[in-house]
From Swiss-Prot:
Protein encoded by which gene: rplL
Entry keyword annotation includes Ribonucleoprotein: yes
Matches recorded under Gene3D superfamilies: 3.30.1390.10, Single helix bin
Gene Ontology molecular-function annotations: mRNA binding; structural constituent of ribosome
InterPro entries attached to this UniProt entry: Ribosomal_bL12, Ribosomal_bL12_C, Ribosomal_bL12_C/ClpS-like, Ribosomal_bL12_oligo, Ribosomal_bL12_oligo_N_sf
Entry keyword set: Ribonucleoprotein, Ribosomal protein
Name this protein carries in UniProt: Large ribosomal subunit protein bL12
Length: 128
């Protein structure tokens, strides 16, 4: 058996179509009994009992929320697909149902980068 490096696997996956990649993910989920869905953090139950003590802490995770797609809806859909890895149908639905979060729980620098990327495509974006 030939030695296959991690880079070989990455290169192979990079050349797959979205449909092939989706099928691969499904097969891997079934084989290993896992889910590729990102966990959603519950904010309501995690509030500190100290009241103002929580307000003093600096927020470290941010949500990038798409407010509107503007005039360049197709460009925004392309950017949403690139950012989230969603399929065309899912990305289109997300853009059409705005305001919707595009990415949740990201560091501030990444949130700013994503906001600039989406605004460059013509969208109105908010960081929460």
């Amino acid at each position: 058996m030939a030695d296959i490096t991690k880079q070989d696997v990455i290169d192979f996956i990079a050349n797959m179509t979205v449909l092939e990649l989706s099928e691969l993910i499904t097969e891997l989920e079934e084989k290993f009994g896992v889910s590729a869905a990102a966990p959603v953090a519950m904010m309501a139950g995690g509030m500190p009992a100290g009241g103002d003590a929580g307000a003093a802490e600096e927020k470290t995770e941010f949500d990038v929320v798409l407010l509107t797609s503007g005039d360049k809806k197709i460009q925004v859909i392309k950017e949403v697909r690139a950012i989230t890895g969603l399929g065309l149908k899912e990305a289109k639905a997300l853009v059409e149902e705005a305001p919707k979060p595009v990415k949740e729980g990201v560091p501030k620098d990444e949130a700013e980068k994503l906001k600039a990327q989406l605004e460059g495509a013509g969208a109105q974006v908010e960081i929460k």
